[in-house]
Amino acid sequence: MRDIQDFDSLMIRLASPDTIRAWSYGEVKKPETINYRTLRPERDGLFCERIFGTTKEWECFCGKFKSIRYKGVICDRCGVEVTHFKVRRERMGHIELAAPVSHIWYYRSVPSRMGLLLNLQVAALRSVLYYEKYIVIDANDTDLEPMQLLTEDEYRDAHERYGAAFTAGMGAGAIKTLLQNINLDELAAQLRAKMIEKGAKSDQRLLRRIEIVENFRASGNKPEWMILDVIPVIPPDLRPMVQLDGGRFATSDLNDLYRRVIHRNSRLSKLMELKAPDIIIRNEKRMLQEAVDALFDNSKRKKAIKGASNRPLKSISDLLKGKQGRFRQNLLGKRVDYSGRSVIVVGPELKLWQCGLPTKMALELFKPFIMKKLVQKEVVSNIKKAKLLVEQEAAEVFAVLDEVVSEHPVLLNRAPTLHRLGIQAFEPVLVEGKAIRLHPLVCKAFNADFDGDQMAIHVPLTQAAQMECWTLMLSARNLLDPANGKTIVFPTQDMVLGLYYLTKERALPEGKKERLYSSVPEVLMAAECHAVGWQEPVLIDYETEPGKIETVRTTPGRILFNEEMPEGVPFTNYALNDKKIRKLIENVFKDKGPWLAVQLLDKLKAVGYKYATYFGATLSMEDMIIPPEKAGMLEKANKEVLEIYNQYKGGHITQEERYNRVVDVWQKTNSNLKEILMKRLQEDKGGFNTIHMMETSGARGSKDQINQLAGMRGLMSKPTGDIIELPIRSNFKEGLNVMEFFISTNGARKGLTDTALKTSDAGYLTRRLVDIAQNVVVNEEDCGTINGIEYAAIKRGDEIRESLSERIAGKYTLERVIHPITGELLIDVNEYITDETAKKIEEAGVETVKLRTVLTCESKHGVCVKCYGRDLARNRIVRIGEAVGIIAAQSIGQPGTQLTMRTFHEGGTASKNVEENRIVFNDYSIIVRGIKGSYVTLKNGHFLFTRKGEFTFSRVLNEYALKKGETALVSTGTRVVKGNPLYTLKNGKEVLSENIAIAEVRDNIIYLTGQEQTIEIRNGSEVVVKENDVIKAGETVGTFDPFADPILAEYDGFVRFEDILPGTTLKEEADEETGVVEKRISDAHFDKMQPRIFISDESGNTVGEDSYFLPGGAQLLVEEGQEIKAGAILAKIAKESVKTKDITGGLPRVSELLEARRPKSPAVLAAIAGVVTIKKGLLKGKRTIMVRDEYGHDVKHLVPIGKRMLVRDGDTVKAGEPLCDGSFDPHDILNILGENALQNYLMKEIKEVYDAQGVTINDKHVGIIVRQMLRKVKIVSVGDTKFIFDQQIDKYRFHEENKRVKEEGGQPAVARPMFQGITKAALNIDSFISAASFQETTKVLTNAAIAGSSDELRGLKENVIIGHLIPAGTGMKQYRDIKLFDKNKSDLDIQMNEILERRRLEAEAAQALEEKELIEEENFLDDL
């Protein structure tokens, strides 16, 4: 027989009345539950033993049959079957209804399924079901319409006029008849014809109707089954009744709801038998309908039925829904046996793979194992005595305990478990006390500290589970963070300080030379005798690499450090701060393997703690040195602020500009003070100032925090995020005055509230991500795709944020990579790129590499090995069965909580990058290649840009000035790689290139330049250089106003206003403080008028074709008729005042991107590339912009009024370029630029939020989530497929159907990709079990039942819910069905038969023995 657990899919359907009767073991006729005197169930009641099975094991109700030997006998007196009481959990009953009722899920949920089928509005359907109106079922030859609603009076009139010529009815019965009359095939054909006829004008309702009809047709469900003639009664042990102390009963709410239904049902039957008046019966039927509604879904009703304590009763739907529902409370999260929890304390003496387990806990957790061992060792004779011994905590027990615990791993978990490293396995070491001891290095992964955190402990029981713990989950095997592949186990805080102190070097006093020592023992002895300081530089002959001895300049501390390290760790001769320690661990891990890395970590921990203790760092007020320059700097800043205020008073600048400039001054002052303070601390005590050491080593504190202690606290922000322009000039050492203290309360409080609120947000984000990606598992070696994405280094301006080698390592190539100069093959197609190959490719000067990525993977379910590439947590190629979807979701969700919790350490100080007012390249020289755009040439030869332009340049990597007699070997335009000769010296020796570059030779100087780059030049910028100039580092290229965006005239002439009318579109306000009149454009009348400026010549003719549109809020700076020169400022728009960026901006931003929300006021993007024409006049209150492409096609774009235009007449735009300001709408990017552009945009945006917080997340994690969001397509043209216009369909199903149609010679369908938010995508997932356990449970189940959905159980979640092993790792089908076979088959068969026969005999013997014991026991009881 197949095991009940052995099934591959699960189907859900509507139950027909016959099915419900077939499930049932009898009809429940009475509302009684149990007899209050005997406390036994009432016959035919809700707990009846005849229907649901006996309450006493192997005994009937009346007691006639009492024994297992009567198993299966049905008692002739009471009718109860002799069986086990557990059947009361599975046997169902039913209630035969006196009148049909509607199922609330199918008529009440939105959209109403019944309403769609019958094409009735919900209100109309309700009025029929609740017996308020009649509905015409059959109109025959009357002038009534079928499905017409009639009130009581209208029905009477019709009856008098037509008599029995028509049929009408009310209630569920009438609806049932209508549903029975539907011919689904005909209806489907009619609706499809209507859809084709309407075409693009068809509405959503029509699409929904077709979908529901098709679902009914495909599933074999009948529409009339949505009306119930009989309702099932769930087994009594699932709605129990429990006696409390004091004789009262606690009962499940379902019993109350069932009782109401039975009451009303029997009353209705009686009334119908008595032939009561119609109105009474109708009322009773309505009440029955309400009672059944409440039973199925009490929360959907307007007035929920309340129980005794005036709380709404929990109906069947409520038992499934929400966090406390069956799905999330009992199926996805169960309480686990063999577990305990306790407070954690630090265990510095432990090895990395150990944890300290309190003896008391171990006794309880390993109880069964101890008992077994005691019996095995013959300490006791049976299990009962062993149990007693354990409970008494006898000495023998402790002797056995050590044996049991050793080499039996345990799992430790710290809530919240945000990523997979929140649960790790350790080898337990017994400790005294009641606290669990945790190794200090694993705290980072658990995010644990020892301020009272608790951890849970679990014991893996089976051999397979223990094996998994040792091989996969052991802490020593999880050194890397799955989110980015960097180490997550590394020393922090005290350990870092200890290591930094030990390896730091003190400067020698002037005139003193390093002493020379011959051997390691000599140096260490000298240091211990204080002949030389631990940090003093010395010279020593030392073995830096195996077999290589050289004289090195180092310190005794570093020698000691290297001696302590395990063999194989490279010689380390520098001061170790946190970053360098991590680098050292990473290098050892990569070069020497994980085992040496684990030994290294334990050594680092020991040495770090030891020398931190010897150092004994303390903080003193003396260590906080307030720079003497502070007073002068504040004085200077005050003067600057006063000057800005005077400019404002004179009306030269606006209020916003004044505010922005003041904030800017204080920001600069603060950052300058910080730099000086850091310098002072560094010079103090020869670099051994404790605060300075803590900060530089990375042990504790940041530059900003130290600045608040000894510099100045700086600017604070209001709760709204605006910066308060009054800075806090004091620091904590000087103390704040009352005003300053009051200002800082804002930030401090905001940090704490944010933390509390945002933690739940991050948790919810993780939950949504897991739900969408949980079924993505690596399930094949190669999907065979020919698509991929081009990767290049990520640059911000000119600084490389992520190098090419970092980005491509660990992925597979899609195309060959050829050396750009030598033409040799660096790596072939479909090859894995190792770290070494990646470096080689980068050094060869390759700019871009086309790779396979998860985004372009074509695996039908999950992803393939070659598109995924490296498993970051293990630093090797991913294995089939890895649950990469969950890892991706955790990698994005887990830092989310850190993002939220980051705010409160800073205490709300405002931080913003100081905006420069010039274009400058500080770190390198450049050669100007081109200046493009619309500009006016000024008298001094500078270019003033009247619109945005482009500045193209090449970076100078090296320059070589040739002296007399030296000859260049390259000419302008030569490509050189590392090692190519550049020029010869006088002596004929060649100088070689150190870079990959392009050479340029001018005036006897060889410049090696990088690739050409382009930056955007802002409107209003003045560029002071010309093409082909060589600009030295730090020289100004151009200047601009960072606080305002000007509108500039492009021609000489006279100003002419249009639609600029004082009082309507022009507001004139006198500033109260300064008395200066400010003229601003108001956007109140933009629907009728468009304020703009023309420039005309003396005779009044317009010069040029352009007019200058003025957006709302612009400040007007010219008068009508005023004569102006090209480049004059006509108006300017102040930039928004800057708010502090808090991660609050971060998390909601990630949420917004992942939910695919359309931004509030999105930018309008150009649909095609071409030339812009702005049309006069308005269309529907919007401005019309035409873009004409090179073939003469025009595309119309509508821009809302009041939006700031980014283009003008005659501008050339690229497809996807914004025409007005606003944020990008991802849906527009998808429609205009396609899937790859959208993926790149989302990747960039999401990673930017995390980068701002210093969190790195690998592309592939974001890629998996984005791929899941792009799984659906929308049908644009149906062709000969079964699809419906506008239907949303899974990409792979779409391709399959098209393939089928093409093979049959038909016309395939056309679809456009859809971008769904994570919540929506999770609800539209193929598995209805997973979707129902996520959100909107009833809606998902309703739809699934109608469609007769089958869940293939592919994902992890649905398998957890039904209690299967998850299809990932060793639980995958291909691993579970492995069969071992012997080459000599005949022997195997004989062996198998012998084993089976032996097992059968053993089972029979055991059963016989059990029955014999039971009978003996019963006979003994009978004798008694």
From Swiss-Prot:
The keyword Zinc applies. It is an enzyme of class 2 (transferase). It catalyses: RNA(n) + a ribonucleoside 5'-triphosphate = RNA(n+1) + diphosphate. Transmembrane segments: none annotated. Its EC number is 2.7.7.6. Mg(2+) binds at D449, D451, D453. The RNAP catalytic core consists of 2 alpha, 1 beta, 1 beta' and 1 omega subunit. When a sigma factor is associated with the core the holoenzyme is formed, which can initiate transcription. This is DNA-directed RNA polymerase subunit beta'. It comes from Treponema denticola (strain ATCC 35405 / DSM 14222 / CIP 103919 / JCM 8153 / KCTC 15104). The gene is rpoC.
